[in-house]
């Protein structure tokens, strides 16, 4: 268990008295720890246990050997129609309603300074697309049901153009909002803006139906590894993926249809009730009847002293900084609305299986937290 902690936290070693959160742990890393402990050690572990007993010795002592073997995710028959995951079905439905919307585009812009080996970059993207089926998947409707089709691996189109600093942000935004065609694909767009001979901006855009924030991080990390090798004339072999996203989608459907769907529906209906309250904040203007997805962001920095104080308070209370800040946010909503029943949706990684850690795909889900 100490070795699992050390690997996931990125530290050399973990001692019996070490605290998971003091070593830099957070809820996403905690999820990976629990999945590893369950599947590799066959021990009954939970996120709640890790939060209640964050010190290694106490956490390990509270674990019990499970009699339920963790089943593996089987590989789907690629000769049969490949169903969508439940998350993909939501995205497919939303895209059919608003195919021109960019609300579910996932962008990333990387500044590349220094000499760029474009051939190595091309080879890196080609390797990524060959490695991850989601990067070459499109979607279709047949007989009233939706399916995903994995296409053969082909060379990625990298759109190259010369550009200057002036208007750069606007150009990137224009690239990001270009609509995707989920029926034709591809659902990964790559643009390379050359600002100077040794200065480029790499713009990556994916549709949410094949990706999420975790996936974008995986893609960038693997892109860096591949480019580092190819640019030096080396062959790069990344660890083999145990499954692909289509395998997960089929496994998820089988799992839910075996009784899990009814259990979860009963739980959430009992917790949230039938009617969901609408948060009525004192806006300057009336809420539109239809969401436009137009909005703005206000960024600001927290002082180092405040951040350290938040972390210290969270550790004393046996919680995470996220939970502490969420409680503060909900208190603020109560102050402005006067409503006692406030529900907040927060994204969860939803990758509680070891096989899914390095996959590019749409796993993230929104979980309702009730005050």
Stretches found by the model and what they are:
Residues 266-276, 315-316, 363-371:
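Helical lid/core segments from catalytic subdomains that handle acyl or acyl-like groups
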Residues 32, 36-39, 45, 76-152, ...:
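Acyl-group handoff/entry surfaces in thioester-processing enzymes
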Residues 232-238, 256-258, 302, 308, ...:
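Acyl-thioester-dependent acyl-group transfer interface
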Residues 107-113, 313, 368-371:
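Short, well-ordered beta-strand elements within core beta-sheets of diverse protein domains
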Residues 293-307:
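DNA breakage-rejoining catalytic core of tyrosine-based enzymes
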Residues 125-141, 279-282, 313-358:
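Hydrophobic "lid/gating" helix adjacent to the active-site nucleophile
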Residues 105-109, 155-158, 295-297, 364-366:
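Short, solvent-exposed beta-strand edge segments and adjacent coil->beta transition regions
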Residues 1-73, 143-153, 244:
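Phosphopantetheine-dependent thiolation modules in NRPS/PKS and related acyl-activating systems
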